[in-house]
């Protein structure tokens, strides 16, 4: 598998995503041309804070459209016009949506927002002449506990250890806190450090 692009599904692609998309697609095509079996994969980062913030942005756009409430000026929200389009689509499909409680409609908002956003991304990829064989959802991996299973497999093979990492090089480290974490033993595979 070659996983490439994998832009967060919180809006349309930008030039930076396109660069990675082109590089990944060319690499995959070169490998295929040389007789390798390749699966082109897109990892959908649809789990975590960014998705919560994205759904919340749509929530506030819905309130703006339906009740003329001002969209909040918060750094964690997505202010783009595409969020307005998503909100309008949701209102078309769910005209009686209850906007009194974000938590109650989070699942609907996140699913509809992700679907809309992934359609934009797939259209952009198609315009670049690219297609992926697999689209893998992070959320589905988490819900199926595949990450925990992988970690257990690594532990059984003694490929991981608990330990501490040094602060990142070349960065201000005033906020760095040494915390115990699971570390992959990459030195077993001739890397310089774990």
Predicted regions and their residues:
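NTP-dependent nucleotidyl-transfer catalytic core
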Residues: 1-194
């Amino acid at each position: 598998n070659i996983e490439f692009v994998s832009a967060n599904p919180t809006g349309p692609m930008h030039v930076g995503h396109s660069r990675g998309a082109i590089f990944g697609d060319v690499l995959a095509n070169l490998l295929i041309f040389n007789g390798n079996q390749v699966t082109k994969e897109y990892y959908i980062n649809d789990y975590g804070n960014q998705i919560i913030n994205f759904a919340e942005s749509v929530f506030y756009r819905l309130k703006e459209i339906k009740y003329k409430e001002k969209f909040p000026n918060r750094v964690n929200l997505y202010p783009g016009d595409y969020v307005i389009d998503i909100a309008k689509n949701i209102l078309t499909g769910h005209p009686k949506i209850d906007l009194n409680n974000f938590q109650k409609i989070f699942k609907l908002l996140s699913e509809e927002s992700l679907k809309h956003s992934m359609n934009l991304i797939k259209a952009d990829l198609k315009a670049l002449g690219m297609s992926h064989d697999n689209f893998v959802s992070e959320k589905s991996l988490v819900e199926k506990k595949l990450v925990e299973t992988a970690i257990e497999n690594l532990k059984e093979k003694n490929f991981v250890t608990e330990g501490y990492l040094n602060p990142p090089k070349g960065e201000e480290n005033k906020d760095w806190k040494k915390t115990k974490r699971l570390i992959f033993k990459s030195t077993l595979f001739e890397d310089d450090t774990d």
